[in-house]
Amino acid sequence: AVSDDGVSYKHHSIVLEDEVSISFPIVYEVGEDKYMTIEGVKANNIRLFKALDFPYSWTCVDTLLTGPWSDPSIYKSGDTYFLFVSTPYVYEDAHIFSSNSFFGPYVEHPMNPVVSKNKRIARNAGNIFEMNNKLYRPVQDCSNMYGEKVRMMEILELSETTYREREIENSPLSFKQDGWNRTKMHTFNIFQINDKMMVATDGAPHNGKLQLRIVKRR
């Protein structure tokens, strides 16, 4: 889909077809190139795609991690890249892998699983992001069902040997009994267009299909 303002979109074309799964795409800029990760449960690996003609053409160039990991999100802190993933199907554990290169190899964090047996906060809901000098990890609350709520974790400590986070006060996000995301919400991705900070999210007011929403930061 294409847009002139980041709010209103029109479908353009299918840019990636895969026999396995193409959910949870996150795009990264490395030098002058653009790369993308997608979830890897059915493929049994986390693959890295490179844009040949951004954003219309992509090719798989590497495998970052082997195993049925879901919802990968990479964040760079200092000279270290951290790859956040969660375990599939039950979604109750979160793991971190680190590398001194975006392209790996990624090694397991000594505190894994950094979240253990907690369906409320284990599964990623979007990209790890920084705002007002604080680092955040949006998470899916899968306690009762898939994609019920999005909660927000503040990452207090992140290194190759340590990890600590806490849930913020206004969590779950934008949740009201009569709101647009009353029964479902499972995506929260921050992005910037020019000087505007925006969020791609979704929600359902009743037990129906999730609907995409673009929200501007005031």
Model-found features: residue ranges?
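Carbohydrate-active catalytic/glycan-binding domains of CAZyme proteins
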Residues: 1-218
